[in-house]
Amino acid sequence: MLLCVEEKKKFPGGFVMTETSDLVIAAAADSVPNIALNDGNAIPQIGLGLLRIDDDAVAPVVESALASGYRHIDGAAGYNNEGGIGRALTATGYNTGERRASLWVTTKLRDSEQGYDSALKAFDRQAGLLQVDYVDMYMLHWPTPFDWRSGETWKAFVKLRDEGRVKTLGVCNFLPEHLERLHDETGEWPAVDQIELHPTWQQREVVAFCKEHGIAVEAYSPMARGADLKAGDGTIERIAATHQVTPAQVILRWHIENGTIIIPKSVHAERQRENLDLFGFALTLEEHAAIDALDGPTRAGHDPMTFSYA
């Protein structure tokens, strides 16, 4: 577990950020493994999810995460807060130079802006809002099979990659049939597929397909928006008590041991640090199997066959 030397900084609106010593920040950042991708790049296994945080509230959240040691942030045009993220990156110096090189920035194309020309135009706007010269990963947000334009859009993504404005190309919410269609049209597998994944919705067929084709799996809603903390009639809580950690840390550790990239969301500095602090314990084989056994038939979020983040 990490030892912290802290002092508190209060932002307008009541958000309190705890400032941590440089030594502790470096230790937290260094503790997070990198996951090797099929394009030769490597992504920090833990990032900060930024869904459902207003643009005027997101900057101190990002600043707090960076101060806690996060080196991976996950945004999207559809979250409507890229401007606030950009303000945080600029305020902390993570928009340029060595600090920028140390940070993995992901954003996603809005579904309504799919298409070759519209995707290029959208990226220009998004990079401007983020106040960065390049993005580490640009992603298709939903497959929208009812209005499929992923192949055409991917060609725009490749152009951005060739120009050095994007390093890695990924997708979100793609099922095997969508991944195969994209590959048929472009000759490429994405580096990452970001999907809803947590103990009660493990998507084993999707995960197996991704592993077979060298696609890294990234989990959003890694705790089912908190619903899985009490899953299995107290299974998670009992494991947490055994290790003297929180139920959230147990679930996140399960993901880590599965080799999954995770982007837990928290607006609280203490919980942000807690979500990084996953490397002072390990699950036993029996504990890991008990969490595996919690898999169920119901997703917490949207259906990739019907949903669009317009």
Protein language model features and the residues they cover:
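CE4/NodB-like, metal-dependent polysaccharide N-deacetylase domain
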Residues: 38, 119-140, 159-163, 185
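Beta/alpha (TIM)-barrel catalytic core signal, keyed to glycine-rich beta->alpha loops juxtaposed to Asp/Glu
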Residues: 143-310
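Short, acidic/polar
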Residues: 54-66, 115-130, 179, 202
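N-terminal binding-site loop/beta-alpha segment at the start of enzyme catalytic domains
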Residues: 3-5, 10-103, 223-224, 307-310
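Generic structural signal for well-ordered alpha-helices
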Residues: 32, 62, 82, 86-89, ...
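A short, structured active-site edge motif that brings together acidic residues
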Residues: 99-113, 136-143, 197
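Acidic-and-aromatic substrate-binding clefts and catalytic sites of carbohydrate-active enzymes
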Residues: 53-56, 76-84, 112-117, 145-148, ...
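Residues at the N-termini of beta-strands
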Residues: 72, 134-137, 168, 192
